[in-house]
Amino acid sequence: MRATRFKETYGPYALVAGGSDGLGAAFAEAIAQRGLNLVLLARQEDRLNATAARLRDTYEIDVIALTADMADYETVKQRVGDLKLSIGLLVYDAAYAPIGRFEDVSEDHLAQAAAVNVRAPLLLTKLLSAPMIERGRGGIVLMSSLAGSQGSPNIAAYAATKAFNAILAEGLWKELKPRGIDVIACMAGAILTPGYQQAESSKPAPGTLEAKDVAEQTLNALGNGPIVIPGAVNKIGRFALMRLLSRRAAIAIMSKNTRGLS
């Protein structure tokens, strides 16, 4: 979709949750390149303001930075509502991933994962889709993960929340398409973000992508179907896990990949 058409369909404002750095910032930049104004939500105020200033100066667009914790949805809802803007595109990239054996993960960490990864995207989608339906146009991007394709030991709760995001997007894709709303879930594999690079002591895993490539492939796929899997290696991997192997075998493979997480 050309930039002009993208802006007409999803503008004038896009909201990116988790837009201060990493993949969220890559989404924000890709959207800015298409001419939309931005509302960026994130917890890290310094990083958020720096990203907002850079995009504002580079692309000469309006960029509003809102410091917010997505676990506190009521505050997020109030602050977004107070803007009284026409938001035609939602990109939900905020996430919280408790890592380790389930028995060792605290209730507070599990509740945080549910709040950030499930409750907030669900309710923010509800909030922003209503005016999109009234206008007869809009777009919603929910970040899922290849980890959500099957059970994933040591990140069991996180993987389950990512499965929720994918299933929600699939249902809304069919439900909202006749209303002019495009919905898609991005089922990404490993992404070269600051967090990933800090966690990985060795070279990146096969299929690891740059954040900008994930953002571009996802936005280019918006309107074409309910799921996008960036990267050829990741597409092949998911096909094998979902179509060629039993669920038991798929979980066993994922268990090997997540064995070192703690």
Specify the residue positions occupied by each region the protein language model found:
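Active-site helix of classical SDR
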Residues: 125, 161
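Conserved glycine-rich cofactor-binding loop
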Residues: 13, 18-21
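Substrate-binding pocket helix/loop in short-chain dehydrogenase/reductase
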Residues: 101-103, 109-114
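Residue(s) in the substrate-gating loop at a strand-loop-helix junction
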Residues: 145
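C-terminal helical subdomain
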Residues: 185, 201-239
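Conserved glycine-rich Rossmann-like NAD(P)H-binding loop of the short-chain dehydrogenase/reductase
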Residues: 34-51
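Active-site loop immediately N-terminal to the catalytic Tyr-X3-Lys motif
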Residues: 103, 152-156
